[in-house]
């Protein structure tokens, strides 16, 4: 343990409470339990996104208490805070989904406000659901004080008739039911067995993707992203996070030391190798923006072209994230990639050690395991996340093609201005093989909030049309989505992007090899449509109204603090 004199020296921010004129401030703090000796300790915030309404977060209040134990053992004064969460799985397919991406920035802002307002010297952030992770790390980058992210862990798979199932099994079950392949009773059995306890959704979906990416970035303890929610290892690494953040204070180690360009390159590399969520593009861009690291959407294509897809994980594969934990977890994958020249081993992490030094403590992948395929025989020779461009997406779009055999799809558009309209068309069998289903005016500004389309995409897959019908949107897709899907189309319809002027019957081309997203239209016809079609007004009420008016394009990470140079005086 650090001695008191050294501890007092670590109070880079909380020392503002020391002077005589701050006696009233200390009076308030004494009511929270602080004694004379505690005013010589650094204040460490412990923030959790605990909530009772979702399995991803239901256990996080107790995890916050564990982190406090670690902080206390390291000699600092822990203070537990809470912030919000929005469950994507519960909000999915409802108007509540508009608040999902919005919550990422609310989380970031609320952490910054709480830690800044209370002059914390460092903090641990604990998250479980999709937007918790990037929201926490955006706050870390903006504040640039010692901080560690601790993931609440992945959920165990459900089991039905001897087979592993998960939440996406239920979403797809609805499609099977609509197609006549399942009874209501069979779907109910899926519903009742898919989620057996606490933890983030179990495949290589957004929560596990972002937890992995943050570990690779270096802001989570090595190995922690793979530990299941109910494991002893998870409880241990939550407590250790409390001790580790005090060590960061001692070392003077800050997020800006860790969040380098090389760190983001490694995060993209591992995301490609594991077949991570399309949402990773959005969130890594946003984190890089907060960290003042130059990262663009097209950078993802650089790594897509050279990093093979190795993981046989859901949604396109057989295994869940807990299976990866059993064969060595994220560190074993990183060791494999490092040995083969894919990662930067010499960059610093939250432990104060380099990536290579951290990985020495971990075993290689279990011999004979089937979760991670060898580089000589990958699941796919390049990465599964592709950035597309063309006259339908001048600023880019994101396609996830893991498990998709179709390299090129050309078909007529069927255009909808909401997911609800598109779902109704699918349920009524109005969508036929070859169609390109388009859902627009659901981007960051248009949604507002860029809702995900898992309900729609899962129904299409469940009906057996996953590789026969393409799905395009200026909104997002869940990490649980697979099939022929393209999202994040930019500029979005609400900004007057070409997708706003696409009409039912227009022929759309999606090409993996040329990375093209195109629709057949003459310049004259496009100009005519632009002159005659009126765009709807921006949403104007409450938090969604605020969000719609300030959020950037998805191609810039849908950030809420992107200012043009003329607005800041900076270039």
From Swiss-Prot:
<feature type="binding site">
    <location>
        <position position="129"/>
    </location>
    <ligand>
        <name>[2Fe-2S] cluster</name>
    </ligand>
</feature>
<feature type="binding site">
    <location>
        <position position="201"/>
    </location>
    <ligand>
        <name>[2Fe-2S] cluster</name>
    </ligand>
</feature>
<comment type="pathway">
    <text>Amino-acid biosynthesis; L-isoleucine biosynthesis; L-isoleucine from 2-oxobutanoate: step 3/4.</text>
</comment>
<keyword id="KW-0408">Iron</keyword>
<keyword id="KW-0001">2Fe-2S</keyword>
<dbReference type="InterPro" id="IPR037237">
    <property type="entry name" value="IlvD/EDD_N"/>
</dbReference>
<dbReference type="InterPro" id="IPR004404">
    <property type="entry name" value="DihydroxyA_deHydtase"/>
</dbReference>
<dbReference type="Pfam" id="PF00920">
    <property type="entry name" value="ILVD_EDD_N"/>
</dbReference>
<protein>
    <recommendedName>
        <fullName>Dihydroxy-acid dehydratase</fullName>
        <ecNumber>4.2.1.9</ecNumber>
    </recommendedName>
</protein>
<dbReference type="GO" id="GO:0009097">
    <property type="term" value="P:isoleucine biosynthetic process"/>
</dbReference>
<keyword id="KW-0411">Iron-sulfur</keyword>
<keyword id="KW-0479">Metal-binding</keyword>
<keyword id="KW-0456">Lyase</keyword>
<feature type="binding site">
    <location>
        <position position="56"/>
    </location>
    <ligand>
        <name>[2Fe-2S] cluster</name>
    </ligand>
</feature>
<comment type="function">
    <text>Functions in the biosynthesis of branched-chain amino acids. Catalyzes the dehydration of (2R,3R)-2,3-dihydroxy-3-methylpentanoate (2,3-dihydroxy-3-methylvalerate) into 2-oxo-3-methylpentanoate (2-oxo-3-methylvalerate) and of (2R)-2,3-dihydroxy-3-methylbutanoate (2,3-dihydroxyisovalerate) into 2-oxo-3-methylbutanoate (2-oxoisovalerate), the penultimate precursor to L-isoleucine and L-valine, respectively.</text>
</comment>
<dbReference type="InterPro" id="IPR000581">
    <property type="entry name" value="ILV_EDD_N"/>
</dbReference>
<comment type="similarity">
    <text>Belongs to the IlvD/Edd family.</text>
</comment>
<feature type="binding site">
    <location>
        <position position="452"/>
    </location>
    <ligand>
        <name>Mg(2+)</name>
    </ligand>
</feature>
<feature type="binding site">
    <location>
        <position position="130"/>
    </location>
    <ligand>
        <name>Mg(2+)</name>
    </ligand>
</feature>
<dbReference type="GO" id="GO:0009099">
    <property type="term" value="P:L-valine biosynthetic process"/>
</dbReference>
<comment type="pathway">
    <text>Amino-acid biosynthesis; L-valine biosynthesis; L-valine from pyruvate: step 3/4.</text>
</comment>
<dbReference type="InterPro" id="IPR056740">
    <property type="entry name" value="ILV_EDD_C"/>
</dbReference>
<feature type="binding site">
    <location>
        <position position="88"/>
    </location>
    <ligand>
        <name>Mg(2+)</name>
    </ligand>
</feature>
<dbReference type="Pfam" id="PF24877">
    <property type="entry name" value="ILV_EDD_C"/>
</dbReference>
<dbReference type="GO" id="GO:0051537">
    <property type="term" value="F:2 iron, 2 sulfur cluster binding"/>
</dbReference>
<keyword id="KW-0100">Branched-chain amino acid biosynthesis</keyword>
<feature type="modified residue" description="N6-carboxylysine">
    <location>
        <position position="131"/>
    </location>
</feature>
<comment type="subunit">
    <text>Homodimer.</text>
</comment>
<feature type="active site" description="Proton acceptor">
    <location>
        <position position="478"/>
    </location>
</feature>
<dbReference type="InterPro" id="IPR042096">
    <property type="entry name" value="Dihydro-acid_dehy_C"/>
</dbReference>
<keyword id="KW-0028">Amino-acid biosynthesis</keyword>
<dbReference type="InterPro" id="IPR020558">
    <property type="entry name" value="DiOHA_6PGluconate_deHydtase_CS"/>
</dbReference>
<dbReference type="InterPro" id="IPR050165">
    <property type="entry name" value="DHAD_IlvD/Edd"/>
</dbReference>
<keyword id="KW-0460">Magnesium</keyword>
<feature type="binding site" description="via carbamate group">
    <location>
        <position position="131"/>
    </location>
    <ligand>
        <name>Mg(2+)</name>
    </ligand>
</feature>
<dbReference type="GO" id="GO:0000287">
    <property type="term" value="F:magnesium ion binding"/>
</dbReference>
<dbReference type="GO" id="GO:0004160">
    <property type="term" value="F:dihydroxy-acid dehydratase activity"/>
</dbReference>
């Amino acid at each position: 343990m650090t001695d008191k004199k050294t501890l007092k020296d670590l109070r880079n921010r909380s020392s503002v409470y020391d002077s005589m004129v701050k006696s009233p401030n200390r009076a308030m703090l004494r009511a929270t339990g602080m004694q004379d000796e505690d005013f010589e300790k650094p204040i460490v915030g412990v923030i959790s996104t605990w909530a009772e309404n979702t399995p991803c977060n239901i256990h996080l209040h107790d995890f916050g208490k564990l982190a406090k134990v670690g902080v206390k053992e390291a000699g600092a004064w822990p203070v537990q805070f809470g912030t919000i969460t929005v469950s994507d799985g519960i909000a999915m397919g409802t108007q509540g989904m508009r608040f999902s991406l919005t919550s990422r920035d609310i989380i970031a802002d609320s952490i910054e406000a709480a830690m800044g307002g209370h002059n914390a010297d460092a903090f641990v952030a604990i998250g479980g659901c999709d937007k918790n992770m990037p929201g926490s790390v955006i706050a870390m980058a903006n504040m640039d004080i010692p901080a560690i992210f601790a993931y609440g862990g992945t959920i165990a798979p459900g089991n039905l008739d001897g087979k592993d199932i998960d939440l996406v099994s239920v979403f797809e079950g609805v499609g099977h039911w609509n197609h006549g392949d399942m009874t209501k009773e069979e779907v109910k059995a899926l519903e009742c067995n898919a989620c057996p306890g606490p933890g983030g959704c179990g495949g290589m979906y957004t929560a596990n993707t972002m937890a992995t990416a943050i570990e690779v970035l270096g802001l989570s303890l090595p190995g922690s992203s793979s530990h299941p929610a109910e494991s002893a290892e998870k409880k241990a690494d939550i407590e250790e996070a409390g001790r580790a953040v005090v060590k960061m204070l001692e070392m003077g180690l800050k997020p800006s030391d860790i969040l380098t360009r090389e760190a983001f390159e490694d995060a993209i590399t591992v995301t490609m190798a594991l077949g991570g969520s399309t949402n990773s593009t959005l969130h890594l861009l946003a984190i890089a923006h907060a960290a003042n690291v130059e990262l663009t959407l097209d950078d993802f294509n650089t790594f897509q072209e050279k990093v093979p897809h190795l993981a046989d994980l859901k949604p396109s594969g057989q295994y869940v994230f807990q299976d990866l934990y059993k064969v060595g977890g994220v560190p074993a994958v990183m060791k494999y990639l490092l040995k083969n020249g894919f990662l930067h081993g010499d960059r610093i992490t939250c432990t104060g050690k380099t990536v290579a030094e951290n990985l020495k403590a971990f075993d290689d992948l279990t011999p004979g395991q089937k979760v991670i395929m060898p580089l000589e025989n990958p699941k796919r020779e390049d990465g599964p996340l592709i950035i597309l461009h063309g006259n339908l997406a001048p600023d880019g779009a994101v396609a996830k093609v893991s498990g998709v055999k179709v390299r090129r799809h050309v078909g007529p558009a069927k255009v909808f201005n909401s997911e609800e309209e598109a779902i109704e068309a699918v349920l009524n069998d109005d969508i036929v093989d070859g169609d390109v289903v388009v859902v627009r005016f659901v981007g960051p500004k248009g949604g507002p909030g860029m809702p995900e389309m898992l309900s729609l995409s899962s129904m299409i897959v469940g009906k057996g049309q996953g590789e026969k019908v393409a799905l395009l949107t200026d909104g997002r897709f869940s990490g649980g989505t697979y099939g022929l899907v393209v999202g994040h189309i930019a500029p979005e319809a609400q900004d007057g992007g070409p997708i706003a002027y696409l009409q039912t019957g227009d022929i759309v081309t999606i090409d993996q090899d040329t990375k093209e997203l195109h629709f057949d239209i003459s310049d004259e016809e496009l100009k005519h449509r632009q002159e005659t079609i009126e765009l709807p007004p921006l949403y104007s009420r409450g938090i969604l109204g605020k969000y719609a008016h300030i959020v950037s394009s998805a191609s810039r990470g849908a950030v809420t603090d992107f200012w043009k140079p003329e607005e800041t005086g900076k270039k």
